[in-house]
């Protein structure tokens, strides 16, 4: 089967050169404030963080707040917890419908990193660029909203409200909320020495979308055309788009099946940044060591040809709606990786063992010469509808 036709601006009576990504100067989750700056900015919110919780709950219920992507707040009644997250990104692909799906998947991913599989409600946050013409706005933004809505329904939830504003750049995001019993989520702080690290989506999305834009910029394309073909770039771009739009819900469910000890999702801080943040949260004195980097095919070579300007080999390259990084018992990890590929979960799910958890000081690192796992594109075997009403 072949991939369905991608977004064509002329099909919507727009100029053939219309590009959604031109309505922002940053891409995807590359908008994040650096981690060290963020921690300093949030210090005042962390003061007396647990006092109220301890007053009425005796600190019995688990709680998670400032410093992680999801908050877990014990409710006053019934032994339940509110699990909530918010996120937003800028356009990273030019297909408005797929961009809506990616934005929704990106919001939900923080819940999935907690092992939460059911979302009770979503809000959508939308910034409509004041640089869009009325025609562009009226053609493009409904596609974005439809993509967001369809992804939320795939996740078993719905969008019941939100906020829409005029903004210089297009902004896409939302809020995901659920109420859980203690056995319905997994706190991200129980990694132990001997665990292994599993990743559920390949790295390199930022590289793929960047070099796809370089196809129209000769001075940039000429720097990399000796290491990658136009077909390679097109396949990597399609694969990146499908991976970003794929929900991490299956992986979240399997975290319970295979006794996951901790997890986070990989987004704007890159795999190393998010691994470091997760390591800091651990109750046991451990460190994470990453030996393998699964990367979209040809994107490692592109990164090296660019002088590693993307930071891909160093683990600092931002990802958008990336996979889950999961700490699993060694004896369970291989079974997790095999199970997630089962056809019963649909096409496209993958996982790799990429490192280990060892005794340490709550840090994370990538070894000097990590093994690069070239992840071949699966788009040629998938029948994916990237635009409402498109036909194969």
Curated annotation (Swiss-Prot):
Principal EC category: transferase
Details of cofactor binding: Binds 1 Mg(2+) ion per monomer.
Catalytic activity: hydrogenselenide + ATP + H2O = selenophosphate + AMP + phosphate + 2 H(+)
Residues with PTM Phosphothreonine: 387
GO biological process terms held by the UniProt record: selenocysteine biosynthetic process
Residues under site feature: Important for catalytic activity: 32
Residues the entry annotates as binding ATP: 32, 67-69, 87, 110, 161-164
Binding site for Mg(2+): 69, 110, 265
Cofactor(s) annotated in UniProt: Mg(2+)
EC identifiers of the protein: 2.7.9.3
Active site residues per record: 31
MF term (GO), any: metal ion binding
Superkingdom to which the source organism belongs: Eukaryota
Keywords assigned by UniProt, alphabetized: ATP-binding, Cell membrane, Kinase, Magnesium, Membrane, Metal-binding, Nucleotide-binding, Nucleus, Phosphoprotein, Selenium, Transferase
GO CC list: cytoplasm; nuclear membrane; plasma membrane
Entry-linked InterPro entries: PurM-like_C_dom, PurM-like_C_sf, PurM-like_N, PurM-like_N_sf, SPS/SelD
Topology of the protein relative to the lipid bilayer: Peripheral membrane protein
Subcellular location(s) per record: Cell membrane; Nucleus membrane
Reported function: Synthesizes selenophosphate from selenide and ATP.
Protein family: Belongs to the selenophosphate synthase 1 family. Class II subfamily.
Subunit structure: Homodimer.
Stated name of the protein: Selenide, water dikinase 1
Organism: Danio rerio
Encoding gene per record: sephs1
